[in-house]
A protein has these predicted regions:
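N-terminal pre-catalytic "stem/leader" segment of glycosyltransferase-like enzymes
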Residues: 1-74, 221-228, 232-241
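Short hydrophobic "strand-cap" motifs at the C-terminus of beta-strands
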Residues: 6-8, 88, 111, 151-154, ...
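Histidine-centered beta-alpha loop that forms part of the nucleotide-sugar donor binding/catalytic region
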Residues: 8, 67-68, 88-93, 113, ...
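Conserved catalytic-core segment of nucleotide-activated headgroup transferases in glycan assembly
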Residues: 18-32, 38, 135-186
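Extended catalytic core of nucleotide-activated donor transferases of GT-like folds
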Residues: 44-107, 114-116
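Donor nucleotide-sugar binding/catalytic pocket of nucleotide-sugar-dependent glycosyltransferases
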Residues: 106-139
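Short alpha-helical donor nucleotide-sugar binding micro-motif in glycosyltransferases
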Residues: 188-193
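Catalytic binding pocket for nucleotide-activated donors in carbohydrate/polymer assembly enzymes
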Residues: 195-250
């Protein structure tokens, strides 16, 4: 099946140190897209199409949309005629064309149960939810825990770095802050950290860092702005199920 994967979550053409994250991925959504595509079953031929070239997708057998932020109103209205799979990974800006796209999506997918409810306040309840996928569920393993807290996020005010400092001070524990460092460094610290603090200042839909901190055995401290966590159960088993779940809907 020929699949048009329409998104602005594009892999950078070259590694840059001045991006949101080092390496080829600007953030968690870019990683999510790349990981999900890496799990594609046989029989699918995927072309990644940027938002400015959306019209190319109209000729494809199946359309997958993983980012609507940079799609024009015309693009969303026209793409809606393809009954695309739409998988959104963060809070969406209410707009008539976007609501129409979600209504016509088959299916409309969010990141968690609470994310479903969040978007339903202005559009509709999503048909399904799919958590952030991982390349290897055994990549993140707990080590001997040490009495420090970890904050790891891209350098953005909404990620709540100041909130993390305040919380760590209230706990009376040292806080390690990691931004713009290689992912391997973050995972190594997660393995040892007793606490992972993520206190965002605005809506955050089931971020990868919280999932990875859960796999690392950290005590995750968050707030009401984090509206998504993994479903109850064995996190590795749950994450193993996410790519097959997604591709069964394509």
């Amino acid at each position: 099946m020929k699949v048009a994967w329409v998104t602005h979550h594009l892999i950078k053409e070259e590694e840059r140190s001045d991006a949101l994250l080092p390496g080829l991925y600007a953030g968690g959504a870019e990683l999510n897209d790349a990981v999900m595509r890496s799990h594609q079953p046989t029989g699918y031929d995927i072309d990644v199409i940027g938002p400015d070239d959306w019209a190319q997708a109209m000729d494809y057998e199946r359309v997958v949309i993983t980012g609507t932020d940079r799609l024009s109103e015309e693009a969303m209205v026209q793409l809606a005629t393809k009954s695309p799979l739409v998988w959104i990974q963060h809070a969406q800006q209410p707009a008539a064309a976007r609501k129409h796209l979600f209504e016509k999506a088959a299916p409309f997918i969010t990141m968690s149960r609470l994310h479903q409810a969040h978007e339903a306040r202005w559009s509709r309840m999503s048909d399904e939810f799919v958590h952030s996928p991982v390349w290897d569920v055994n990549e993140v393993q707990p080590a001997t825990k040490e009495p420090f807290a970890l904050f790891a996020a891209r350098n953005h005010p909404a990620k709540g770095k100041i909130n993390a400092r305040i919380k760590a001070d209230a706990l009376g524990v040292p806080l390690v802050e990691l931004s713009n460092v290689d992912r391997s460094v973050v995972l190594e610290h997660m393995a040892r950290a007793q606490w992972f603090i993520h206190l965002p200042k605005e809506f955050d839909a089931c971020p990868r860092t919280v999932i990875e901190a859960t796999l690392a055995g950290c005590e995750v401290i968050t707030n009401a702005h984090l509206v998504g966590r993994l479903e109850p159960g064995d996190p590795r088993e749950i994450l193993t199920q996410q790519p097959p779940k997604f591709w069964s809907l394509v």
